[in-house]
Swiss-Prot record:
It comes from the Eukaryota. Transcription factor that play a central role in proper axial mesendoderm morphogenesis and endoderm formation. Required for efficient differentiation of cells from the primitive streak stage to blood, by acting early in the recruitment and/or expansion of mesodermal progenitors to the hemangioblastic and hematopoietic lineages. Also involved in the morphogenesis of the heart and the gut during embryogenesis. Acts as a negative regulator of brachyury expression. Transmembrane segments: none annotated. This is Homeobox protein MIXL1. Residues 22-92 are annotated as: Disordered. GO terms for cellular component: chromatin; nucleoplasm. It is found in: Nucleus.
Amino acid sequence: MATAESRALQFAEGAAFPAYRAPHAGGALLPPPSPAAALLPAPPAGPGPATFAGFLGRDPGPAPPPPASLGSPAPPKGAAAPSASQRRKRTSFSAEQLQLLELVFRRTRYPDIHLRERLAALTLLPESRIQVWFQNRRAKSRRQSGKSFQPLARPEIILNHCAPGTETKCLKPQLPLEVDVNCLPEPNGVGGGISDSSSQGQNFETCSPLSEDIGSKLDSWEEHIFSAFGNF
C-alpha cells in the first residue's frame, strides 16, 4: 500500500515539473511543454525536414529537377524531311508542246524573256519551266554533238560486210538522226530555203505522222511564234 502511494506521488511530481528537452539541432531552445500537453495525443508523424524548415521560417524550395538521363530522348540529328510543298514537281509536256518547243529551238537556242513569255502563253506552261527546258535541251544537244565527232569505221571494213552491188550505199555515212528535232520541216520563206529532198525522205521515214488536230495547232502556233522573230 505504501509502495503504491509513493509511485503515485512521484508521477504527480513528474507531471507538475517536467524535465526540459535537449536543445534542438538548430540551436533554438524549445519552450517547456505545459502539463496539459502530456494528456493530448501525439501528433501524426510527418516529413521532418519540411516541418523543421517551416519552423525556422525558411521555404523548402522547389524539388530538384530529374537527372538528364531520365528525360525524354532527344530528336535524331540530321536534316528534316522536305515537305510536300518543297518538293519539285515534274512537268509533263504534251506532244504539241514538245513539237512547238523543238521548232523554236531550231531557230534560236537562247530565247529571250519576251519569246519565253509568248511560249508560256501558247503552251500554258510556266515561263520558268520553259527556261529550264531550253537549258536541258542545250545540254542534250552538246552531248549529241560530242558523240557525232567520234571516228567512223574505215571504208574498207564496211565494204567487206556489204553485199555485191551495194558498195555505194555502204559508203554513205550513217549519221544519227534526231527524231524530235528533224520531224518538223523548215517553213518556206522563213530563215532559209527548202531543205534537201534526201533529208526530207529520211525524216519522213523516221518520224511518225502527226494527227490533223496537232498539225492545225502547230500551224496556228507557228504564225504567232514566227511573228516574234521578225527578220530572223
